[in-house]
């Protein structure tokens, strides 16, 4: 956080609420620890700037506390709504009570007696109807007796950086649920799903898979969290499974790799590769991909890592992250809708070119200085994944290996620039 980086963690090893502890007693559960981490992230400004720390929280779909986790932000958002609406209602009705206490049509102390002051009685009834606490109503009347003509009551708004959001929990991370193919099949079959204890792998609870799926869908609709990470598919596309499985991602989810690894990221601004006639400068983009792959490779030895373990694994796997930005701007400038077949074909082609060129450049570097230390024991897995990528870039619907769910291949037909499709194919031919 301090250096301006984000973290991603899978918290599924934490015991569920009520599970027994080795030293006796019961666990306080997953949510108590997540709330602590949330507060810590909110207190630390990322890289010393005004931006808060970036954090991804991931929990497996079979965790005993998964239901509370899914509902977490929904409930917190409701608290914000209650704070905003309640504060404004309280201000309104307390103001009405104060004004009634100073009604000039009523004289003396009768102004503060609802039996004698009909306006005050009406204001009190309205305040009670709006669920304004009785002690607040009486406090206003007491203030009015002392000569005050107005009362201050702080109101809140729904600005994302407002005090209302700072008051509630769960606002300092992206939340995701890791779902497996087994869970998704249980949803389709409308079957039961077992929530598993962390200590002894016993069944903590059986719930209906469809009900949990609906809960996830509603939460995502209501407050944009949690997201989904498809655990089975992610690990089937894992290039280095001999080093362990993939359990989590970085905050934006573009980096998914082994625990205790890190990745330096670089993004290419796609608008810089747009010619005046609207066409995409493929040779310049390929050159930039080669150049930045080399730059990121060099950065592995120059980067500062937060722990010895992360530094060691980053050296052993030499992870790098090359991406692009401004795809929306490029599509708009070219006159294509973001959510269109043409837009998806352009985006898919550019992504395939970038990734294929990066892997081919990596192989070229390896031919000069040797592959990354953990390559040999992962070679067959990496080549399988690369060949699957190549098939997708060529638009193939079959021939994939080691996949339960096949990818959506690159669709050449709607792409307005077939040169992009050709370049994508060539890039992956070279990579493999």
Role assignments for model-derived ranges:
Residues 188, 195, 202-203, 207-233:
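Structured secondary-structure scaffolds
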Residues 54, 71-72, 77-206:
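Extended, regular secondary-structure scaffolds
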Residues 21, 44-56, 77-81, 127, ...:
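Inter-helical turn/loop segments and adjacent helix faces that build the functional surface
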Residues 200-202, 287-311, 315, 319, ...:
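Internal maturation/activation junctions in enzymes
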């Amino acid at each position: 956080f301090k250096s301006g980086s984000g973290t991603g963690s899978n918290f599924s090893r934490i015991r569920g609420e009520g599970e027994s502890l080795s030293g006796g007693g019961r666990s306080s559960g997953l949510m108590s620890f997540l709330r602590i981490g949330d507060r810590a992230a909110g207190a630390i400004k990322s890289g010393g700037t005004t931006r808060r720390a970036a954090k991804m929280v991931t929990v497996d779909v079979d965790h005993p506390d998964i239901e509370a986790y899914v509902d977490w932000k929904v409930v917190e958002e409701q608290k914000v709504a209650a704070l905003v609406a309640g504060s404004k209602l309280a201000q309104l009705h307390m103001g009405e009570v104060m004004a009634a206490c100073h009604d000039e049509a009523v004289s003396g102390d009768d102004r503060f007696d609802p039996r004698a002051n009909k306006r005050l009685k009406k204001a009190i009834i309205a305040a009670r109807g709006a669920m304004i606490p009785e002690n607040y109503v009486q406090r206003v009347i007491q203030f009015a007796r002392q000569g005050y003509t107005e009362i201050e009551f702080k109101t809140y708004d729904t600005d994302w950086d407002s005090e209302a959001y700072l008051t509630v929990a769960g606002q300092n991370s992206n939340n995701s649920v890791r779902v497996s193919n087994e869970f998704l099949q249980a949803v389709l079959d409308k079957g039961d799903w077992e929530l598993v204890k962390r200590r002894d792998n016993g069944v903590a609870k059986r719930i209906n898979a469809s009900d949990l799926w609906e809960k996830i869908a509603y939460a995502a609709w209501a407050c944009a969290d949690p997201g989904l990470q498809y655990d089975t598919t992610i690990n089937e596309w894992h290039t280095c499974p001999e080093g362990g499985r993939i359990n989590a991602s970085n905050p934006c989810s573009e980096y998914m790799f082994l625990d205790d690894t890190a990745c330096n990221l670089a993004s290419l601004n796609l608008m810089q590769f747009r010619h005046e006639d609207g066409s995409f400068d493929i040779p310049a983009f390929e050159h930039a991909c080669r150049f930045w792959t080399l730059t990121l490779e060099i950065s592995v030895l120059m980067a500062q890592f937060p722990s010895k373990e992360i530094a060691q694994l980053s050296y052993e796997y030499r992870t790098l992250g090359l991406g692009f930005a401004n795809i929306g701007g490029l599509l708009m400038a070219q006159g294509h809708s973001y959510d269109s077949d043409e837009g998806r074909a352009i985006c898919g082609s550019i992504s395939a070119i970038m990734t294929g060129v990066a892997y081919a450049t990596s192989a070229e570097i390896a031919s000069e200085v040797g592959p990354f230390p953990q390559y040999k024991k992962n070679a067959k897995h990496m080549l399988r994944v690369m060949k699957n990528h190549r098939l997708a870039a060529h638009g193939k619907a079959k021939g994939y290996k080691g996949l339960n769910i096949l990818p959506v291949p690159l669709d050449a037909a709607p792409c307005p620039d077939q040169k992009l499709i050709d370049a994508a194919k060539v890039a992956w031919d070279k990579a493999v």
